[in-house]
Amino acid sequence: MGSNEQIHRDKLIIDTDPGIDDSMTILMAFRAPTVEIIGLTTIFGNTTTKNATQNALLLCERAGHPEVPVAEGSAEPLKGGEPRVADFVHGSDGLGNLFLPAPTSKKVDENAAEFMVNKVSQFPGEVSILALGPLTNVALAIKRDPSFASKVKKIVVLGGAFFAAGNVSPAAEANIYGDPEAADIVFTSGADVDVVGINITTQVCFTDEDLLELRNSKGKHAQFLCDMCQFYRDWHAESDGFHGIFLHDPVSFTALVHPEYFTFKKGVVRVETQGICTGHTLMDQGLKKWNSENPWSGYKPISVAWTVDVPNVLAFVKELLMAP
């Protein structure tokens, strides 16, 4: 490549609840040559929103990018009430109980929804959002600006379980369950949405051998990540009998930058917001012509990840995490 040629970098906001696999993803994204992170926005999920903000600031500092703005998001789901926080998976600090020193940088004054709306309006058609937690902030941005859905380039969502069991109940996956109303707003907004569910992400994992390979690598953040992953790994062993970790968030980031490693099906997706199936994601694949209108009628289809090329995704994740 000629010295005057520049790699095109796609503008990206990561909406995140760091979180151990979020931390892996954020540090990966900062190393990815085709991505320009223009901000992090924070949400509850793996930890509280307040904790997530501190962790996002810490991760930007650790990545060598303290200038990247961090905007704090909603502390609770759209309908209010206590947020569901998975501290039993990610530790009480969200980072595997490493209890790191506080960041020196500060969050910006805008809240997450304001930040998203402003950036997407500043760069219409150029900004993608990688949503790694409950979708409250993205839904608030859509509600705040009726043109947001048409101006955002793409929203890639980690969430849902499609024709598969959930991970917080037989019906629901954690991010969607964390704010089902918000997820339904995002999925029916008319935006260009790709969803990567746990039926895909649980196919891609780091075994204990992979974690050891990472620890022994010259990766810039390898030791830090492996220290953090110990808590996450021990939870997997205890809860699932699995000796390793699922790479939910890194797989979703890979779907953003390497969609060719996945196949997608298009269909309208609705989210159940009440009853025993709260948080359930159900897609109309368009296989049947319905005789009458139903709650799926009239909405723009979104893309749901259907298959994944596991070896290529793993190779990409390792390449970024093990780069010196």
Curated annotation (Swiss-Prot):
<comment type="similarity">
    <text>Belongs to the IUNH family.</text>
</comment>
<comment type="function">
    <text>Involved in pyrimidine breakdown.</text>
</comment>
<protein>
    <recommendedName>
        <fullName>Probable uridine nucleosidase 1</fullName>
        <ecNumber>3.2.2.3</ecNumber>
    </recommendedName>
</protein>
<dbReference type="InterPro" id="IPR036452">
    <property type="entry name" value="Ribo_hydro-like"/>
</dbReference>
<dbReference type="GO" id="GO:0006152">
    <property type="term" value="P:purine nucleoside catabolic process"/>
</dbReference>
<dbReference type="InterPro" id="IPR001910">
    <property type="entry name" value="Inosine/uridine_hydrolase_dom"/>
</dbReference>
<dbReference type="Pfam" id="PF01156">
    <property type="entry name" value="IU_nuc_hydro"/>
</dbReference>
<dbReference type="InterPro" id="IPR023186">
    <property type="entry name" value="IUNH"/>
</dbReference>
<dbReference type="GO" id="GO:0008477">
    <property type="term" value="F:purine nucleosidase activity"/>
</dbReference>
<keyword id="KW-0378">Hydrolase</keyword>
<dbReference type="GO" id="GO:0045437">
    <property type="term" value="F:uridine nucleosidase activity"/>
</dbReference>
<keyword id="KW-0326">Glycosidase</keyword>
<dbReference type="GO" id="GO:0005829">
    <property type="term" value="C:cytosol"/>
</dbReference>
<keyword id="KW-0963">Cytoplasm</keyword>
<feature type="active site">
    <location>
        <position position="248"/>
    </location>
</feature>
